[in-house]
């Protein structure tokens, strides 16, 4: 039953099929906790090269697949990748994160942005996704991903990651029309990019609105939700059958609002009890998550307990097992292996 030759397991779950166990993958399952990744990073120190050189990105995406056989293989990339294609150059500095030398602060800058032409500015994405589909066949589901409008705007306006988001909040609360026009353009760009990823082979796409949890619920309703909805609406017009996931870090205060975005699956962070999340979202909404990444530093017996507890709280359908955030640097690889083995041995019948 778990080896349907036509449709991979995670995709079956994402389309609502009732299965013997939840599918499992991890956010940031390719990355710095893996020694094989660190060796490749030492050889190719530029993050943009690792994520935009198709051969390197394919190799990195497949490292956790070869090691652990997760039910989902997500392409190795970054949420900022499409920005250069609309006229916002950026770099990603190891240990510092993204840097945008000319942050978007004025109406004139917003007016100068151009529409995204992925074939022209992101041709490596096609190679990455097509190759991943060929490599994993129907043994795993290939996931694409994008940033959501508010989060991409936060990076582009701040010029880097931020703890306070004072620059973009200053724009939101003093020049909202400039920010709304920017968010609208970003929503168009992201929808184009999601469609492109699906056309290139992505079977499920996750949208990260990582910084929307920094908004009050009333500001979320104005600056985040309408633009998430626009992305989803545009994608569903052309690709109605591709499941879409929404993830927000620190989402406890806006969980019900996430459910109004139009996505098929809500990825829940670890600060919310999953049984409570299902109650708040309604049984019809599928969920993903939501184990604390710190659990993977614990004993294997504790990891097993937490996996079983999380699956039981989620109920026996409409759940994809994942962490509530990305895998942390320094996580023991053996514990990641144990996590996947334990999750895949689980049965709702037991």
Swiss-Prot record:
The keyword Transmembrane does not apply. Keywords: Cytoplasm, Decarboxylase, Lyase, Porphyrin biosynthesis. It catalyses: uroporphyrinogen III + 4 H(+) = coproporphyrinogen III + 4 CO2. InterPro entries: UROD/MetE-like_sf, Uroporphyrinogen_deCO2ase_HemE, Uroporphyrinogen_deCOase. GO terms for biological process: protoporphyrinogen IX biosynthetic process. Substrate binds at residues 28-32, 78, 155, 210, 325. It is an enzyme of class 4 (lyase). Pathway: Porphyrin-containing compound metabolism; protoporphyrin-IX biosynthesis; coproporphyrinogen-III from 5-aminolevulinate: step 4/4. One of its GO terms (cellular component) is cytoplasm. Its EC number is 4.1.1.37. It is found in: Cytoplasm. CDD domains: URO-D. GO terms for molecular function: uroporphyrinogen decarboxylase activity. The record marks 78 as: Transition state stabilizer. Disulfide bonds: none annotated. Belongs to the uroporphyrinogen decarboxylase family. Homodimer. HAMAP family: URO_D. Catalyzes the decarboxylation of four acetate groups of uroporphyrinogen-III to yield coproporphyrinogen-III. This is Uroporphyrinogen decarboxylase.
